[in-house]
Amino acid sequence: MAASATTMLLKYPTLCAMPNSSSSSNNNDLPTSIPLNNNNNLLSNKNKILQTPNINTSTNKIITKAVASPVFPTLKTTSNTPSSIRSLVHEFDPEIPPEDALTPPSTWYTEPAFYSHELERIFYKGWQVAGYSEQVKEKNQYFTGSLGNVEYLVSRDGQGELHAFHNVCTHRASILACGSGKKSCFVCPYHGWVYGLDGSLAKASKATETQNLDPKELGLAPLKVAEWGPFILISLDRSLDANADVGTEWIGKSAEDVKAHAFDPNLKFTHRSEFPMECNWKVFCDNYLDSSYHVPYAHKYYAAELDFDTYNTEMIEKCVIQRVGSSSNKPDGFDRLGTEAFYAFIYPNFAVERYGTWMTTMHVVPMGQRKCKLVVDYYLEKAMLDDKAYIDKGIAINDNVQKEDKVLCESVQRGLETPAYRSGRYVMPIEKGIHHFHCWLHETLQ
C-alpha cells in the first residue's frame, strides 16, 4: 500500500534493429526514404532529401482486411495480474495529491516481471506507432519493426491495400523479413515458404505429401493497422473498436490539437537519429515530462533558446502538451524555435514536436527492463530544404540535447538500481506532467 510523503521518508521508420536489407533474393528491393540507421553525414545525399514525398494528410483509415491463420494466435496474454505485480502497482497511490505524494517505487523501473507486465497491459493494448505513411506510399513497399516480443511487418500490396502482420513464418516460426524496401512477395529464408504482400501463403515448398495443408489457414497472423495523417499505427488488441476514430482512441481529446501541428503537407522528412539508452523506457519519459525543470542545469544552449516565464504544461487524458515561447536573445543569433515550441507527449511513448520550420517526432522504443532506444525523426518545411547549413545546425543542436539526456537517464537508471533509493518526491507544480503519467500507468497496469 502506498504512503504519503508525510508518513513515509524517502515505457522510421522501421524499428527493426537489423540493417536495411531484403529477406529474399528478389532484385526488386528498393530503399524507402526513411533510413534505418543513424547517418552521421546529415546531408550526404541531398537528392534523397529532395525526393522525399509529402506527408499524407488524409483522414484516419483503419484496415482490418487480412488473410489470417485461425490456428496461429494473434497474442498470448494472461487475464489476471499476478499478486506480486499487483502489490508493486499499488505501492503508488494516485489518490494522494502530488504535493504530498511519493513517486512510484524504484522497482517499477528495475523489476523484469514488472516490465513484462507493462508490455502486456500497455504496449499490447490500444494503438502503437509502427512507422510512417511515406514508408509504404507505393504498392509492394514494406517495413518491419519490433514491439516488445512482437515482430511486425507492415506492407502495401499490389492493389494498394495496407496490411500489418506478425513477422513470423507460420511453418517453423522464422522471422520472415527485416528492414524495409519493395518486394513482390516475401520468401522465408529458412525453408522458402512464399507469402503475398496481403499475408496469404502462396507456396509451401516441397509439401507435396503433407495431408490437409490448406494455404488459407496458414497465412500470416494479422494485426490491426491504421493510417492517421503521417503516422501508421498498429494494434494487437482484439477488443479494439475498428469503427472508432483512430486519433481519439490513440490520443483522446487532444487529437485535434496534435493534428493541427502534425498534418502539414508542407513538411518533408529530412533525417533520422537513434540513441540507444541503458535505462528503462519510463526514465526517459519522466525526463521528457518535467516541464523543462532539468533544462537550465543540463542543457545550457537549449535553455538559452527558451523564455521560461511562458512555459505552460497541460494534461488532457492520454496526452501532456507543453508550450513555451522562445527567447528574444537567440544563441549565436540562430532562430531554431521560431516564436513558440509545441511538445505533445502521447502516452505511452511517442511525442510530436513543432517549432520554427521543424517537426520532430520522438519514439521511445522499449527494448528490455533497463534498455530502450530513442528514435528521433526530423521533418522540415520545403522552403528550407536547400539550406544545408541551417539543416545541419538545427539537427546538431537537437541531437546534442538527446545526447545530454542519454547521460542523465542512464545515470538515473544506475541510481534506481542502488539500495539507497526507493521513492522520491514531486516538485510541484513543475512536475505535474510526470505525476499525471504515473497515474495513467497505475490505472493501466492494475
From Swiss-Prot:
InterPro entries: Rieske_2Fe-2S (IPR017941), Rieske_2Fe-2S_sf (IPR036922), Ring_hydroxy_dOase_asu_C_dom (IPR015879), Rng_hydr_dOase-A (IPR001663). Keywords: 2Fe-2S, Chloroplast, Iron, Iron-sulfur, Magnesium, Metal-binding, Monooxygenase, Oxidoreductase, Plastid, Stress response, Transit peptide. It is found in: Plastid, Chloroplast stroma. Pathway: Amine and polyamine biosynthesis; betaine biosynthesis via choline pathway; betaine aldehyde from choline (monooxygenase route): step 1/1. Residues 127-234 form the Rieske domain. GO terms for cellular component: chloroplast stroma. Expressed in roots and leaves. Residues 1-65 form a transit peptide. Fe cation binds at H294, H299. It is an enzyme of class 1 (oxidoreductase). Its main location: plastid. It comes from the Eukaryota. [2Fe-2S] cluster binds at C169, H171, C188, H191. Belongs to the choline monooxygenase family. Catalyzes the first step of the osmoprotectant glycine betaine synthesis. This is Choline monooxygenase, chloroplastic. It comes from Beta vulgaris.
